[in-house]
Amino acid sequence: RSCVNSWNSPVFNLTGLTTLKLPFYASSILKLSSIENVCVSMPDLASTPRLIVGGGSNLVVLEPEFDGVVLRPEIQCFKPVQTGDDVYLEVGAGHSWHHTVMQTLNEGWFGLENLALIPGWMGAAPVQNIGAYGVELKDHCHRVKLYDFEEQAVIELAASELAFGYRHSILKESPDRFLVLTVTLKLSTRPQPRVEYGAIAEELQRQGLNASIPLDVAKAVMSIRQAKLPDPDETPNVGSFFKNPVVRTAVADRLKARFPEMPTYPDGEQTKILYLFVWYFRYGRCKTKYQYPSG
């Protein structure tokens, strides 16, 4: 919806594009439905302030007025190529992440089940290397197709070139340089569910689900997430997002000896991730609920 802002110029009300639904206005919006569309449009925007907005679950709007162009990567390709037990699936940046997870499971392509119900679009997934319940995007990312604003060209980077880390990638280091166009995932027709994460095993047992069936694992994950967070369509929120501390292995081991129930996870040879927030919330060490004023 167009209106007028403090710059005395036509703007678009984009409040509905973010899951927090905070006031958000931009001077223009450009919907990108294909790679060809990107190649034609982007050179003209080389010096224009721009903001990429996909599913809007990673965006907290602090300044309601953006004097620039909002880019909406709505590319919808879904191209599988099967090689033996492996399936290489190229997915457009505009696909819903959760819908992609469920579609792959229904097709019999496995690996993403632990990442069910993560909000947002496919294009954001490699930027911060999304992860949950013991699985990260890097475990199943084969390559990413990007538009490089510096080179003004479409390029491809293999997963090994993206420098994936804990909620990190080179795309996160250079947010103004790259626009994700498609992500190629490497999945398998042979299920290998990962249910070692305690909450999943407990939820599978509680519901009488089968730990060897990926779709059942996804159902358990969805139940866990739904119990923790409201539907953003009903109650605006940005989902469950936090980053646990990464410490040296020796420090993690000392803390583990003192607090045996505290979960840890290796992050390279010298460091471990401490799942402090999971531990606090799950074991009742942080039970207080806060209600912040909005508006």
PLM regions with names:
Residues 1, 54-59, 101-102, 176-177, ...:
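Short, mixed-charge, low-aromatic patches
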Residues 1-10, 105-119, 174-176, 180, ...:
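Short N-terminal signal/transit or membrane-insertion segments
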Residues 3-150:
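Anion-binding (especially nucleotide phosphate/pyrophosphate-binding) glycine-rich loop
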Residues 16-19, 154-295:
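Phosphate/pyrophosphate- and phosphate-bearing ligand-binding catalytic cores of soluble enzymes
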